[in-house]
């Protein structure tokens, strides 16, 4: 169930208003999967008549949905909590930090009135009621099992025309560097019908781009149907009236020939492959507890390019993993040079307590890991620039999302750009009013390119 009222978010904070005397502010930190949980909590409170604002100055209670994936994310979460505590706010700590540290947070932050785990956010109404009665609440399940569906109220904050849809929760993989299974539990997939129902709800709200997410989207359905079921899901979504469907977190082992064929044949599925490969060298992948990947990565990428020449490839990579030698890093550099990805995100390894990687010998010094990150980014940048430059003179579809009030330019994205992580397309001022184009997918002639972004002009309108 989705609330019908929408307001543009500001600074990643959720905005709601209602007639209820109680005022609750929401602050979201972390990934888009966490964002969906935030939106469900907002929807639940809105359905009960609570007033919710992004303005923490006026709020009696602040719900902070936190991230604890890596140290940098934890530090950001802690800074936000300390800042609110210094203001004397009553705080409800939700999300991964709450799941990670549990009652320790209540002990160390007196202003924390409740902690809500990743599998417990559906109880936010009861938690808030107990807090208002003076209780300090520990609502953290040891093993998260809950997964939200289309029947759980949700208040979207991602704009009127783009929405994430979580197809599964949790993860069954045990990568050596990752703490997510501890924070989110094992994989729990939603049914195809549940996902289609929510997609149809979103289509009625005018959504133009739907982004399917989970920890490993290509493993969708294995726990529910006994085999990977993404191809079946994509074909079921072909009947949903949403022009762009994008898939994030496609692990290579799950991109079977059937899935790649579904990408090709389902008209509203974008040929955009988000592949978190992490590394290329077999020994590093083995140390990461991903030994299966080295046997499929190159062959898979070649197969995708053969079947879908227009495919857009994004990957994320980790440098400085424990024991990574110069030769292994050079192998990764050569891999990036040869594969010519459209978009690459590079991260220096973060040593996380509770992971197998934290115990490994030969930890790479921070300075070396950062230098390797910088070098890999420098290798990828001219590749990304060349990919963009090759589009000059072509006409591409652009989803218009906002207007630059200073220049009059219309700003949006082509299908090759995912929200937040990729580039954007800036179109010179048009005689057509922004309000007439907002949320529409229009043809645009690309006239210029930058490292990550494109510029152009509206070509023609039917």
UniProtKB/Swiss-Prot annotation:
GO terms for molecular function: 4 iron, 4 sulfur cluster binding; aspartic acid methylthiotransferase activity; metal ion binding; protein methylthiotransferase activity. One of its GO terms (cellular component) is cytosol. Residues 389-460 form the TRAM domain. Gene3D superfamilies: Methylthiotransferase, N-terminal domain (3.40.50.12160), Nucleic acid-binding proteins (2.40.50.140), tm_1862 like domain (3.80.30.20). Keywords: 4Fe-4S, Cytoplasm, Iron, Iron-sulfur, Metal-binding, S-adenosyl-L-methionine, Transferase. Its EC number is 2.8.4.4. Binds 2 [4Fe-4S] clusters. One cluster is coordinated with 3 cysteines and an exchangeable S-adenosyl-L-methionine. Residues 22-133 form the MTTase N-terminal domain. Its cofactor is [4Fe-4S] cluster. PROSITE patterns: MTTASE_N, MTTASE_RADICAL, RADICAL_SAM, TRAM. [4Fe-4S] cluster 1 binds at residues 31, 67, 96. One of its GO terms (biological process) is tRNA modification. It comes from the Bacteria. Residues 157-386 form the Radical SAM core domain. Its main location: cytoplasm. HAMAP family: MTTase_RimO. Belongs to the methylthiotransferase family. RimO subfamily. Catalyzes the methylthiolation of an aspartic acid residue of ribosomal protein uS12. This is Ribosomal protein uS12 methylthiotransferase RimO. The lineage of its organism: Bacteria, Bacillati, Cyanobacteriota, Cyanophyceae, Synechococcales.
